[in-house]
Amino acid sequence: MRSIYCGQVNEAHAGQTITLCGWVHRRRDLGGLIFIDMRDREGIVQVFFDPDKPDAFALASELRGEFCIQVSGVVRTRPDSQRNSDMATGAIEVFAHELTIINRAEPLPLDFNQVNSEEQRLKFRYLDLRRPEMAKYLKTRAKASAFVRRFMDEHGFLDIETPMLTKATPEGARDYLVPSRVHKGKFYALPQSPQLFKQLLMMSGFDRYYQIVKCFRDEDLRADRQPEFTQIDVETSFMTAPQVRELMEEMIRNLWQHVLAVDLGDFPVMTFDEAMRRFGSDKPDLRLPMELVDVADLLTAVEFAVFAGPANDPKGRVAALKVPGGAELSRKQIDEYTKFVGIYGAKGLAWMKVNEAANGIEGVQSPVAKFLSDEIVREILARTGAADGDIIFFGADSKKVVADAIGALRLKVGRDLGLMENSWKPLWVIDFPMFEEDSEGGLAAMHHPFTAPSNLGPSELKANPLSAYANAYDMVINGYEVGGGSVRIHNSEMQATVFDILGITPAEQRLKFGFLLDALKYGTPPHAGLAFGLDRLSMLLTGTDNIRDVIAFPKTTAAACLMTDAPSFANQAQMSELAIATTVKGDE
């Protein structure tokens, strides 16, 4: 029906007769001529109708926004005075000879010329996706996916599918459960990741595996999370962690070059401990030239319990954050930041404005200065590198609260004051703790329970699990964790030890993971891998800050689809066939 896309017509086609299919983006009548901007997924082109072609002209007078049409006509170059540099096709226009109205459109519930509510956009997603901006997002995602498939194929990886209906495993979030009709009372789980299946593929001899796969997690949502999401899932045998990182870094560097023509350069490597100490986050945004600086050793003897308490507590921390130019902040703004850090558990926010750094305590303005000596103030200024016109914020609490609160404050103040560099800052974060304490006083795996420790045997790990580091690695770009992985446990004794530490009884181990423990007994190769979030990568590549923009039919933050009204109640016949009942009625 078409010979070319609207957005692909250019001066090289001048004089040619072409056929276009698409939608009326805009219509206007000018001096006896009718002009339309005609749109398809590749872009927009101007088409005009002249009374010299009376049939097409008469029909064009009926055109309205979003009519689906077919146009045949001749490509003409525009006079210099009429060229539109804002359009990729702005040097040409199409003189229409024939027009077919394929389908008319009722008045739209969305207005493409203004900002529509998120609710309306999701309810009428099939219309929202017609917008050129949305088409650009999904085309970029498709381009990224195609590149990844080529790269993986060229490097010897096999695209192997793993099951969607599987068994529930503890991976940190709730599972989506699917009732079995055949096995009444039993449930499948939709996979949170293909983790165990890809490890089993390594045991099966498929030493380089990948797939671009849907995963499901029933967890609280936010701007960069969805209940169903897409992973670029990778696993390898006989490769070390540095080798895996090197290969995957090459893929991401080449992806950025392919899609954005940007050279990311070599990725720096930072330990988890360093990232938390300097930035208060295990996914630091390095575009912001501000760091947390330890000052506890200066404050152990001050007569100010807010500082002295954490400074003398092995589990406490006092950190300073210098904000360039921050002395201009008003008291009202500082009070707002004090409320902000309270969200993260901080009980307050001490501050120090630097008016004349050379004058030490006489050159600063701070409600806590009266508790400090001139020597201490000068050392704080020296350590933070503070200059005239800066402000220093202090976090004094447990290490976790200081990291969470001042780490978040760093990002918020940096954005508010426009201190964020317009650049790409990727890095690897490595050497994560193997375990962390959970809310009930037990231990939880920081990544997942199949991650191998770094250079520890089972007995050493069991003796002191909280001091163990995992052979794990995350890739971070501009403050987003875009991928994470690890070297996996490849012997049954170590795997059973990790399960023991996590409080999984031998009986539970057999029930939930018996197949894995058995498989580990039959010549398992060393293996490692990782998974990238394709949605998150696409979000970065397109420049949007909302992951829903790069997913064709996303869910809301309440995990609902406004367009199809999912989830919905099942009828009683379906429930009976599945031998299940619910305590919630359909009208509640």
Curated annotation (Swiss-Prot):
Sequence segments annotated as region (Aspartate): 195-198
Gene3D superfamilies in the record: Bira Bifunctional Protein, Domain 2, GAD-like domain, Nucleic acid-binding proteins
Binding site for L-aspartate: E171, R217, H447, R488
Highest taxon of source: Bacteria
UniProt record, GO biological process: aspartyl-tRNA aminoacylation
Keywords for the protein's UniProt record, in alphabetical order: Aminoacyl-tRNA synthetase, ATP-binding, Cytoplasm, Ligase, Nucleotide-binding, Protein biosynthesis
Location of the protein in the cell: Cytoplasm
Claim: Aminoacyl-tRNA synthetase is one of the keywords in the record: yes
Catalyses which reaction(s): tRNA(Asp) + L-aspartate + ATP = L-aspartyl-tRNA(Asp) + AMP + diphosphate
InterPro entries assigned: Aa-tRNA-synt_II (IPR004364), aa-tRNA-synth_II (IPR006195), aa-tRNA-synth_II/BPL/LPL (IPR045864), Asp-tRNA-ligase_1 (IPR004524), Asp-tRNA-ligase_1_N (IPR047089), Asp/Asn-tRNA-synth_IIb (IPR002312), AspRS_core (IPR047090), GAD-like_sf (IPR004115)
Main localization category: cytoplasm
Binding residues for ATP: R217, D218, E219, Q226, E481, G533, L534, D535, R536
CDD domains registered for this protein in UniProt: AspRS_core, EcAspRS_like_N
Family statement drawn from the similarity comment of this UniProt entry: Belongs to the class-II aminoacyl-tRNA synthetase family. Type 1 subfamily.
NCBIfam families: aspS_bact, PRK00476.1
Subunit structure: Homodimer.
Protein name (database record): Aspartate--tRNA ligase
